C-alpha cells in the first residue's frame, strides 16, 4: 500500500475518488452500518454515504426506524465499504450522533418530491397490514402537500459517524494483503499500525 497519510480521512478521500473514477459500475457510496439492537444482537444493513468531512461520515434515515432506535440506545456503530472490483475494503468504528436540523433540512430540500413524501408516509421498520396500506398513506400525503412545500418531518434526518478507528484493506497476491489501521488517540492524533493479513 502506497501513500499512507498521517490522517485516515485523507486516505479515505483518495480511495473514494479512485473507486469513483476506476471502479466501473459500482455504487461507491454504498456502505453497511452495524448497530447493536434493543434485543442485544448486532444487525447490519446497507445505507448510502451522503457526505464525508474531516469530522466523519454522514448518512440519513428515519430516526424512529430500527437503526435509529438502536443508535439512540447505543451510538457505537461500525461502517464498512467493500469494493470487490478493486480489491479494497474499509472498516470504520465510531460514534453516531445526529447532525444539526439545518443540515438535515438542507439535504431534505435537495431530494425528489417522491422521496420527501416517502419519508412522511413510511413508518420505517414498523409492521404494516398490506401493500395497499402503504400506497394509501403515500396518496394521503400527496394530497396533504399538494401545491405546498414538502417540509422535513421531525423524525427524519442525518447522523454523522465520528470515527475512533479506520482500517484499510488492500488485496494482494498470495493472500498477503495490506491492512493498515488508524486508531484515534486522546490527543486526537492517529496511531498507525500494520496488521497481518
What spans do the regions from the language model cover?
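Binding-site signature for planar aromatic cofactors or substrates
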Residues: 1-197
Amino acid at each position: 500500500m502506497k501513500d499512507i497519510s498521517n490522517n485516515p480521512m485523507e486516505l479515505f478521500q483518495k480511495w473514494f475518488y479512485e473507486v469513483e473514477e476506476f471502479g466501473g459500475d459500482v455504487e461507491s457510496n454504498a456502505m453497511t452500518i452495524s448497530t447493536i439492537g434493543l434485543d442485544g444482537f448486532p444487525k447490519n444493513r446497507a445505507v448510502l454515504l451522503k457526505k464525508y468531512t474531516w469530522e466523519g461520515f454522514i448518512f440519513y434515515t428515519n430516526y424512529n426506524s430500527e437503526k435509529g432506535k438502536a443508535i439512540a440506545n447505543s451510538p457505537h456503530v461500525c461502517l464498512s465499504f467493500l469494493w470487490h472490483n478493486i480489491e479494497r475494503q474499509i472498516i470504520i468504528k465510531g460514534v453516531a450522533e445526529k447532525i444539526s436540523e439545518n443540515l438535515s433540512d438542507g439535504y431534505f430540500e435537495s431530494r425528489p418530491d417522491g422521496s420527501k413524501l416517502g419519508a412522511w408516509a413510511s413508518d420505517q421498520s414498523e409492521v404494516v397490514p398490506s401493500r395497499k396500506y402503504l400506497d394509501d398513506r403515500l396518496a394521503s400525503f400527496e394530497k396533504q402537500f399538494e401545491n405546498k412545500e414538502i417540509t422535513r418531518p421531525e423524525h427524519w434526518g442525518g447522523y454523522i459517524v465520528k470515527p475512533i478507528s479506520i482500517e484499510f484493506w488492500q488485496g494482494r497476491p498470495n493472500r498477503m494483503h495490506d491492512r493498515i489501521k488508524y486508531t484515534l488517540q486522546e490527543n486526537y492524533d492517529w496511531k498507525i499500525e500494520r496488521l497481518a493479513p
